[in-house]
Regions:
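Cofactor-binding active-site loop characterized by glycine-rich and histidine/acidic residues
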Residues: 42-163, 317, 334-335, 339-340, ...
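Glycine-/acidic-rich phosphate or pyrophosphate-binding loops and their flanking alpha/beta elements
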Residues: 261-264, 296-297, 306, 316-331, ...
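Non-catalytic terminal/interface segments that mediate subunit docking, oligomerization
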Residues: 66, 271, 279-393, 398-408, ...
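N-terminal amphipathic, basic-rich helices that act as targeting or association modules
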Residues: 1-81, 245-260, 269, 273-279
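Long, well-ordered, tryptophan-enriched scaffold segments
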Residues: 4, 175-321
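Peripheral docking tails and interdomain loops at the edges
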Residues: 300-304, 308-311, 421-423, 443, ...
Length: 621
């Protein structure tokens, strides 16, 4: 039996002899690499924390002791050591275990995560609850150096310094988030790495002075009384110390015994402690070591080479956005681009290489990204904020307060709108129509295909006010022709005209509606098909025209129904003297779990076959 096969629960690692820890780490890495090569997943970040996770399981006792993983994509070894190795065949698949910690999956998952920079706040709250309940367990928050660029982490550190009981923060420093880190914190942590000799210097000086007969001990005490001044000169973690958080490190994150010693020291302190751990993202798999950004989140790949098994034959929406933005920027020098640590994922990396002075990666800081874009707009530029739908949620007040109240011309390029699949409820982009649609001055569009995205971007930069374009993950739809026409404000596109029933589809659901139309036509029920284009404002003029010859309206959107464009259509219909039937095809008032997008569509009833069944049942066709 392999060492890994002996791990069936959180206590089992403590039965593995210390001499075999290195071999166990190698087995875990081989398992992770082979699994991700077959099924995909977050690879590089997980390869970097194998020894760190082992050291925590050897030093602490989950689930009694609480380990909170910031973001959570690096929790695979944690899931293995807590007894879920047998479930990895279903990792990130519908009905299987999640790729992130989930409290309802295991008692060892202390707190659900998925977004960045939350772990210190959550850990601080859990440590405070522990103290109020008179309990003694440890609380450990594991946060990466990338997540430490998020403002919420500093808000939590500011409060953590007041702790009078033990709370451990593990800073997993691999010099990257998804792409390379940016900003002052990244430079600060780099300076710490280069001054790692401080702790050794401190120990050596104290030992040497103590050996001086008669004067040594008094000199050491004298130095201790002036330690703050000395620290200002030597301590690499003084930023944290000034916040009241004791700094320990930096420590080799791949040396289990050293990690265990520093965890033992950290646990003895009745205050907040930050343990600075240096790890290598992608460790143990050469392609991931060379290109950790490319192996952050991967699909299936060839084990020997790391080359993806599936090659893209057609561009995805992110590619279309990237190419079009560069073309538009060549025509207008006022166009600038902002990303919150997602240059590759949002397609802005190429723009940054072409126009480095007009490109701004602000780190994991969506609030700052939005307001800095507002400042750029107020200063006469034409900014685009490229961001995932689920991450723009984090900057909601800035969209409302800093952009829309002032009616500033900021373009929001909202990638991953709609279902995204395997990353689950924290990443599904199914709320943006709802949280943006309620804001005055905001205009929202969604393209039906790749060519329309190009035209909508061109329109957005000429519009002159806050505007959002939402588009899905994955291959760009190329159906319904390459017909191009200039986008007109608030105007939909009538694709096929029939009578009686009209399908009103938005964005990614236009292609689905086209399949529905074809199937219903074959059943003798031809339908009108409208590409709505604008979720806000809806084309009330076209709807009024259709109401003269149509009785049934069907809205289709890849967003939750509440607050979506379908309810806007229902409100319009209710104001008409003629009684109209409005059917909504949208997502339920629930979080959508992880799984393949096609499986999720069927499960949620928004695939073409499910929609046809709903309409046949309702209208007795």
């Amino acid at each position: 039996m392999s060492r890994l096969d002996q791990i069936n629960g959180p206590a089992d690692i403590r039965r593995i002899p210390a001499a075999e820890w290195g071999a166990l780490a190698s087995e875990i890495r081989r398992f992770l690499i082979s699994h991700c090569a077959e099924c995909g997943g977050h690879l590089a970040s997980n390869l970097g924390v194998v020894e760190l996770t082992m050291a925590m399981y050897l030093s602490f006792c989950p689930p009694t002791d609480k380990i909170i993983w910031d973001v959570g994509h690096q929790s695979y070894t944690h899931k293995i050591l807590s007894g879920r190795k047998k479930d990895f065949a279903g990792l990130r698949s519908f009905g299987g275990i999640a790729g992130f910690p989930k409290r309802n999956e295991s008692p060892c998952d202390a707190f659900n995560t998925g977004h960045s920079s939350t772990s210190i706040s959550a850990g601080l709250g859990m440590a405070t609850a522990r103290d109020l309940r008179g309990e003694q367990h440890a609380v450990i928050s594991v946060i990466g150096d990338g997540a430490l660029t998020g403002g919420m982490a500093y808000e939590a550190l500011n409060n953590a310094g007041r702790m009078k009981s033990n709370f451990i923060i593990v800073l997993n420093d691999n010099r990257m988030s998804i792409s390379e880190n940016v900003g002052g914190m990244s430079a600060y942590l780099n300076s710490i790495r280069t001054s790692a000799g401080y702790n050794r210097l401190k120990e050596n000086v104290a030992e040497a002075l103590s050996a001086i007969p008669g004067l040594g001990k008094r000199m050491v005490e004298s130095l201790r009384t002036t330690k703050n001044g000395i620290k200002q000169l030597f301590v690499p973690g003084m930023l944290f110390e000034n916040l009241g958080v004791t700094y320990l490190g930096p420590v080799d994150g791949h040396d289990i015994k050293k990690l265990m010693r520093v965890f033992e020291e950290a646990r003895r302190l009745n205050r907040a402690v930050l343990v600075h751990v240096i790890t290598e993202k992608g460790k143990g798999y050469r392609p991931a070591e060379r290109h950790p950004d490319l192996f952050h989140g991967v699909g299936p790949f060839e084990l020997a080479t790391g080359v993806p098994k599936k090659n893209k034959h057609y561009p995805d929406y992110t590619d279309i956005f990237s190419k079009t933005l560069i073309q538009l920027a060549a025509e207008d020098s006022r166009i600038v681009a902002v990303t919150a640590a997602m240059p590759e994922g949002t397609g802005l990396a190429a723009f940054g290489r072409r126009y480095p002075q007009r490109y701004f990666d602000v780190g994991i800081a969506e609030q700052h990204a939005v307001t800095s874009a507002a400042g750029l707009a107020a200063g006469g530029m034409k900014p685009v904020v490229a961001v995932y739908s689920s991450f723009l949620q984090r900057g909601f007040d800035q969209v409302l307060h800093d952009v829309c109240i002032q009616n500033l011309p900021v373009v929001f390029a909202i990638d991953r709108a709609g279902l995204v699949g395997a990353d689950g409820e924290t990443h599904q982009g199914v709320f943006d129509l709802s949280y943006l649609g309620c804001i005055p001055n905001m205009t929202i569009l969604a393209p039906k295909n790749c060519w329309e995205l190009e035209e909508e971007l061109r329109f957005a930069f000429s519009y002159g006010g806050p505007i959002a374009i939402r588009y899905p993950r994955g291959q760009a739809y190329r159906g319904l022709g390459e017909h191009r026409e200039p986008i007109r404000f608030g105007k939909a596109e009538l694709l096929f005209r029939e009578e009686k029933t009209a399908l009103l589809a938005l964005g990614s659901m236009v292609s689905t509606a086209e399949h529905v139309r074809e199937k219903l036509k074959a059943l003798g029920q031809p339908c009108t098909l409208v590409n709505m284009r604008f979720a806000k404002p809806i084309d009330r003029e076209l709807l009024a025209e259709l109401a003269e010859t149509h009785q049934n309206f069907v809205t289709l959107e890849e967003n939750v129904l509440r607050g979506g464009f379908g309810l806007e259509v229902a409100e319009w219909a209710s104001s008409k003297e003629k009684e109209l039937s409005v059917t909504h095809i949208a997502l339920p008032d629930a979080y959508v779990e992880h799984g393949d997008v096609s499986v999720l569509r069927q499960h949620l009833g928004i695939d073409s076959d499910s929609i046809v069944r709903v309409l046949r049942d309702k209208y007795h066709w």
